[in-house]
């Protein structure tokens, strides 16, 4: 699992569409599908029903997974803001 895979899944779940997620991420729809399949295979869960790029139906496991994924991404963002921000402030003081 990578942070990028989590990001791809949260965006796909938000739109309930692989095609719309691809547009937001500026990558191809097959690339979105590939990243999500890596997650599905690693955790052996079905995140969504449907195989087309149009509308996908998020499964119960998929909804739970996206909540955890979004929380992980939020915590990483907070970590970056906290410690990268300190590094920038220290650099300005010198």
Language model region names:
Residues 9, 21-22, 59-62:
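Hydrophobic two-helix hairpin corresponding to the core of helix-turn-helix DNA-binding domains
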Residues 19, 37-44, 77:
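Residue-level detection of the helix-turn-helix DNA-binding "recognition helix"
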Residues 85-94:
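Interdomain hinge and pocket-entrance segments immediately C-terminal to HTH DNA-binding domains
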Residues 28, 35-38:
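Residues within the DNA-recognition helix of helix-turn-helix
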Residues 60-75:
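Short, solvent-exposed amphipathic helices
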Residues 40-58:
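A short LG(V/I)-centered, amphipathic sequence patch enriched
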Residues 1-15, 33, 63:
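Short alpha-helical elements of helix-turn-helix
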Residues 12-26:
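Short helix-boundary/capping micro-motifs
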